Amino acid sequence: MEQQKIPQATAKRLPLYYRFIQNLSLSGKQRVSSAELSEAVKVDSATIRRDFSYFGALGKKGYGYNVNYLLSFFRETLDQDDITRVALIGVGNLGTAFLHYNFTKNNNTKIEMAFDISEEKVGTEIGGIPVYHLDELEERLSSDIQVAILTVPATVAQSVADRLAETNVHGILNFTPARLNVSDNIRIHHIDLAVELQTLVYFLKNYPQ
């Protein structure tokens, strides 16, 4: 996907398209129009056509898109056959939920290990995932783990990120309110659930449908 040099906004929508196309394929549907895609994923059809245009001719005018072809294309584009191994740091309520879920709908993403400081959790398995002490972070993180999920208290998020920067981790999904400072070779996606909720409430009050 990096080699395509597509806009980041488009890249963020690709997994959404892929998930819907997977469902279409499972239902036996052979083709789909941009209008049908638009209705399903709540992205306007012009944006979908523009997103798809970055990859060449994925469909035919008047016919739409071949579902099996799209499925194969996005599977390759999103590296669905390559497993991305993930570490989770912080086994609180949210972290525990992630361990039980473990992205079962994503064939190419899997949490391999978790870290915490709680004596009750260290040395156990949650959702089949081993939980190690945070002191063992650098020792336990193998070279093939390149993504980390942070669900630690905000007060320690930066120090954990600093330690991750010394490993082979190149991507951090940050669920803490802290805004982290890391080197340019590490990509961070911030997901602040409180901010998202406040934004939703604001839109409900000020932009009623």
UniProtKB/Swiss-Prot annotation:
The keyword Cell inner membrane does not apply. Homodimer. NAD(+) binds at residues 90-95. GO terms for cellular component: cytoplasm. Belongs to the transcriptional regulatory Rex family. InterPro entries: CoA-bd, NAD(P)-bd_dom_sf, Rex_DNA-bd_C_dom, Tscrpt_rep_Rex, WH-like_DNA-bd_sf, WH_DNA-bd_sf. GO terms for molecular function: DNA binding; DNA-binding transcription factor activity. Signal peptide: none annotated. This is Redox-sensing transcriptional repressor Rex. It comes from Bacillus cereus (strain Q1). It is found in: Cytoplasm. It comes from the Bacteria. The keyword Protease does not apply. Keywords: Cytoplasm, DNA-binding, NAD, Repressor, Transcription, Transcription regulation. Modulates transcription in response to changes in cellular NADH/NAD(+) redox state. Residues 16-55 bind DNA. SMART domains: CoA_binding. One of its GO terms (biological process) is negative regulation of DNA-templated transcription.
